[in-house]
Structure formats: C-alpha cells, structure tokens
Amino acid sequence: MKSAKQIATALLVGMFTFSAVGCSMVEKRPEAINSKVVATIYGNQTITRGEIDKLAKGTVEQLKSQYGDSYEKNEEAVAALKKQKEQILTSLIDQKIFLKKAKDQKITLTKDEIKTNVDDVYAQYQQEFKTESEFKSQLSQYGYTVAEFKDQLKNRAISNKLIQQVVKDVKVSDDEAKKYYDSHKNSYTQSPNTVHLAHILVKTEKEAKAVKARIDKGEDFATVAKQVSTDGSKEKGGDLGDIQENDSNYDKTFMAAALKLNDNQVSAPVHTQFGWHVIKCIKKTEYPVKDFNSVKDDIKQTVLSTKQKSVYQKTLKKWESQANIDKNEKNLM
C-alpha cells in the first residue's frame, strides 16, 4: 500500500503537469521561482524572490487572516503584498549598501556592542513571549531562524554605527535654534494651545457650498450639521470638542484651514481625503510661550535630528547612485 506521503507526491506531480499546459513547467517549480533575481547591486550581489518571499511571510499570514486562503484573488490584498515586497526590497538593497560601506571603512562591533545590540535586544524580544518555542514560532512566521534574526540585529547595529559616522560632524548653533524657535513658537507654549471646532462633512463640493450658503444666511450650524453631515459627530451638531493645535490625529489640510479661523468664524468648503468640510471655530485657547533659554536644548536636539536625517538621506542617495542597482521588479510577484 502506498504511503500518504507518496500519494500526496503523486497528486502534486499531477497538479504541476496540469497547470503547466501552455507554459514552461520549470517556471512552476518553487526552486525556480525562489531563485529569480529581483535586484542586482554592485554587479555581483543579488537579491532573489526567495529572500523577499521569506521576509514577506508575516504579511502573507495577515492577508490570509483578513481575506482567506484565496487572498491572491483579491486586488486589494495583492496590492498590499506588492507594496510590502517593494519595501522589503528597498530595505535589503540599502542593507547591502550599508554593509559594503561599513566593510570598506572597517567598521565592526566590539564585544560590548554585540552584547548591547544583539544579545540584550534578542533577550528583550524573547521576554515578550511566554515561552522560547512561542518566540521561535513567531520568528519563523516572519521568515527568520534564531541565527538569522541575530545576524539581522548585528547588521542593523553595524548600519547604525556607519550612520553615526556619517552624521558625526553635524552641529546646531544657537542662531539656528533661535530661528527655529521664532518660527515654531506655538509648539513651545506653557500648555498646548487648543481650538474648539465643529464641522459638517459632505461628499461633494456642491453640497459643501450649499451648506456654507445656509450658514451664511443665518441658519444654526449645529442644526444644519444634524441634518446633512455624514460624520459621526452630526448627533452633537458637528462638535469635535477641544483639539490641540498640533494634534496629528486630524487631517493636516483640515487643521491648517481650521487654525486660520477666528472665534465663531466659519470656513469656506475644505477638501480632504474624507470628503468636503465646512468648519466652525467656536473658540481658540492660547497660552504664553516659554522663554527661549528654557527650551533651547530641546530645540537643538530637534534641529539636530532634522539636519542629521538630511545628511543621511543625501549620503544614501549618493551611495545608491554608485551601487549600480539593477531592479527586475516583475519578479516580485
């Protein structure tokens, strides 16, 4: 009697034979797919489909959970997977560039740095799970063995050490800090400035203009909101309550328009990703600005981070232009 494994093997052979009609059978073999080159760097370093797919395993599991095992038939799911694979590809390319540059500059990790950035970090991750086997299972879901994960932590630490070398000469003067302070005073008030807002959300500009016309003619804002707004705040007359001026939970375009309003002023129609808004500023509450010297160190750190990021990005762009990157993104999917 044939074993279950032999029967399964026979079924798989039959499936591949059937699906190969009209195309090259070798293209259907997993090893052929895994070995497809997605990118070449420096002319001799490659990134394969298998490497990408391995690191995309976690995303695939999430998509299966959300869309079912046939997620590949869903355009939204496929688009999400493609986007994730593109991000993985970019990360792998940059990592290879970093590691080559680090090698060229003879940047390595000391024993203490390995303990801090590899062993200790690994232990921190492991503590998030009840058992070691549960942690290893999670690693496997995201495409890593323990050794590979530790290698990844080591590579990240080397890359960070290289980046610190790149930005080590970046400084911030008192004049730069004062200039930033003068143009961002609202971020350094004794308490966060707030604005009490209400809004009416509709689908089209035509509807928004009609809403604004009704308000301009003297109709009560809250009454109109309850009648026509599509937002959940309609039951409260569109009232959103007090919002901090720098609240990142709100759409930037929405907040920019709202902050231009004076107390009891109503905006013209404002378009955002959610639709068309008519916004009312009920009341602004503003607080005194802190003295420059009391916030100078914080500002210097903020400006330093921005300048370092700019130097890093320019350097990376230069390195990428020198890396002879050849992408074949059709092999991603």
Curated annotation (Swiss-Prot):
Q: Which family does it belong to?
A: Belongs to the PrsA family.
This chain belongs to which protein, by name? Foldase protein PrsA
Q: Which domain of life is it from?
A: Bacteria
This entry carries the following GO cellular component terms, namely: plasma membrane
- Domain PpiC positions: 192-283
Q: In this UniProt entry, which residues carry a covalently attached lipid of the kind N-palmitoyl cysteine?
A: C23
Q: Name one GO biological process term.
A: protein folding
Describe its function. Answer: Plays a major role in protein secretion by helping the post-translocational extracellular folding of several secreted proteins.
Membrane-spanning segments: none
Which Enzyme Commission number(s) are on file for it? 5.2.1.8
Q: How does it sit in the membrane?
A: Lipid-anchor
